[in-house]
Amino acid sequence: MEVKVENIRAIDMLKARVKNRVARSKCFKNASLILIGITTLSIALNIYLIINYTIQKTSSESEHHTSSPPTESNKEASTISTDNPDINPNSQHPTQQSTENPTLNPAASVSPSETEPASTPDTTNRLSSVDRSTAQPSESRTKTKPTVHTRNNPSTASSTQSPPRATTKAIRRATTFRMSSTGKRPTTTSVQSDSSTTTQNHEETGSANPQASVSTMQN
């Protein structure tokens, strides 16, 4: 009977150990499950954070690209201009020219007055001689014009002399016509008076023309 009791106790001890192991195993299982869940959650969080980081990075890069090209082009242009200063010298030094111009303008305003020679009697005499030389041709021209008129005076005199001849001829013809029609001798008084008037007019015109020519020569 004692052997049976000992066997029963041994069996109970084995059962207790098995239960403990099972309990321990269950705890391990639960612990392992908890650990697995925690790891999965951490992995999910890590994945979420990585995705958000990539999205933010792409958006920031796109914004940077949209804003950066003008600045980069300006930088490139500035580097090109510094590398090649002979391309646009006026564009590179506008401020220098603007600052130098005020200093140059007073010098330019002062230089003409300083460089101009003072007027001397010699220069005034030269100017007066030049004015006289320029005035003499005009006077000579004015003098030559009356000579042309004096040359034309004989023609005018001839033209003035021609009408009296025509008038005397007409008067003679009229007298001959009267003689033939009346058969009487015409009175010569009218003819002589007409011819005398014409000759007087001719003398007056001839005397007036030389006086006009002399007055023009004197002028």
UniProtKB/Swiss-Prot annotation:
List all topological domains (Intravirion). 1-30
Enumerate the subcellular locations listed in this protein's record, separating them with semicolons: Host membrane; Virion
Q: Which keywords appear in this protein's UniProt record, sorted alphabetically? A: Glycoprotein, Host membrane, Host-virus interaction, Inhibition of host innate immune response by virus, Inhibition of host RIG-I by virus, Inhibition of host RLR pathway by virus, Membrane, Signal-anchor, Transmembrane, Transmembrane helix, Viral attachment to host cell, Viral immunoevasion, Virion, Virus entry into host cell
Polar residues composition bias: which ranges? 76-142, 149-164, 206-219
List the GO biological process terms. Answer: symbiont entry into host cell; symbiont-mediated suppression of host cytoplasmic pattern recognition receptor signaling pathway via inhibition of RIG-I activity; virion attachment to host cell
| Any single Gene Ontology cellular-component annotation | membrane
TM regions (residue ranges): 31-51
The name of this protein is: Major surface glycoprotein G
Which gene is this protein's source? G
